[in-house]
Amino acid sequence: ILKNAKTFVCRIINLSSNQFNIPELENSMGDMISKFSHAKVKLENPNITIYLIFTNKENFFGFSKQVKEKSRPKKIKSYPHELDWKLTRVMINLIGLKQGETVCDPFCGAGTTLLEAESMGIHAIGLDFDKKMFEATKDNLKMNGYKSKIFNSDFQELVKISEKFDGIVTDLPYGKNTKISEKPEEILKRFISILPKKKKIAIMYKKELGDNLKLNGLKKYQIYRHKSLTRTILIK
């Protein structure tokens, strides 16, 4: 991994119920790796980021190479609370979508999932019932020269187009700062009920929204963001 890298950083993501001293673990990993390579620790913009991810059932080890800013998709329109681009890529990778396959985001917002997928060589389809968001996605795609298909329609359109995509990656709207009148927990319940059974799935939502849901066949992980927001990711 570090053969041609001059710099690296270690990052630990704890999705388990165990408590860890994450800064101490990251420092220990960095010290250990430094002893076996010529690469040096660099906290900002390293050549390689090494990840250790803990969950209650299994642990994951991996790495990501430095992404040059000029090669990343650009946005001319963005909005508060939209999905972080790095987390979007994590979700796409977690369900194993490959180049040439197609991802669908039924709550595409300003198009983060579509932009990141296209930049990874994955085709994309987006849905959003909000005309303003639909237009924002269209403008952002056009700016980057991407040809993703987008529909100004409700998420229930998934049922009609399920044969056109291989997986779903989305961040459900929270109700706050959106034009949705229906309660977010009701949206989540209805959304889960229509999910195609044979598709790869990564869904993110606020933890408390799905506390009472039956989630057969879906793995659940939680990411603590700050004291007032813990997100749940469902993976299939």
Where are these regions (language model features)?
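Phosphate-coordination loops involved in phosphoryl transfer and adenosine-cofactor binding
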Residues: 4-7, 100
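Class I S-adenosyl-L-methionine-dependent methyltransferase catalytic core
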Residues: 15-31, 38-236
